Amino acid sequence: MTTITCNADLEEGMAALATLDPVWGRIIARTGIPPLRRRDSGFVSLASIIVSQQLSVASAHAVWARVESVLSPLTPDRVLVASDEEMRLSGLSRPKQKTLRAVAAAITENRLDLTSLETATPEFVHAHMTAVSGIGPWTADVYLLFCLGHRDGFAAGDLAVQEAAKVAFDLPLRPKPAELTELAEAWRPWRGVAARLLWAYYAALKSREGISA
């Protein structure tokens, strides 16, 4: 099994992590089973990730509703023929308009094959996706984790994951992506569960203790 599809998969990974380090046992005691957060793979889900980046949940939902309305049906071809006015009406920032168009072009030109990524390694997915203009490490990581459901995906560049790791593992400073990637090597092949637990742990800490990102 290389993908996470249900809570039973999460529980298997949680048990494996808990045997590696007692810190995970304490995290799990605080969070319980973290949200699965699976979504379909493909262009629409990738577009949703791009739209929601650096927005609050409420803002992301509002902009996404406008994107789906203005650019319906949301396909790569529809994005490529969208006028500048339609893009403006969708509520997307100019950088996100550019990224969405770049992704649509990469798919139609067969430079980005989202179907082939479903059986690829995390490293290949990351390299393949970030080769497209506008797709950064965070976008690739989130797609890998929640759209492909890879059990060993991770999100070392996510600020909430970094902050949760800092608190949980009693680190002096919030780890940089490279530092967190190195720390997470010990969590293979369950880094996808580790990421979900750290997100859930961050949410618990933020709601109860008021930590900030």
Describe each region flagged by the PLM.
Residues 1-34, 122-123, 137-213:
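C-terminal accessory module of base-excision DNA glycosylases/AP lyases that mediates lesion recognition
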Residues 45-50, 82-86, 124-128, 160, ...:
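A general alpha-helix detector
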Residues 36-44, 91-95, 184-192:
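Structural motif
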Residues 12, 18-65, 69-72:
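A positional/architectural concept
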Residues 46-51, 100-104, 143-144, 194-198:
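Short alpha-helical scaffolding segments that buttress acidic/His motifs in well-ordered protein cores
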Residues 4, 23, 27, 55-56, ...:
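Alpha-helical ds-nucleic-acid-binding substructure associated with the helix-hairpin-helix region
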Residues 51, 84, 108, 112, ...:
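A broad detector of the eukaryotic-type serine/threonine protein kinase catalytic domain
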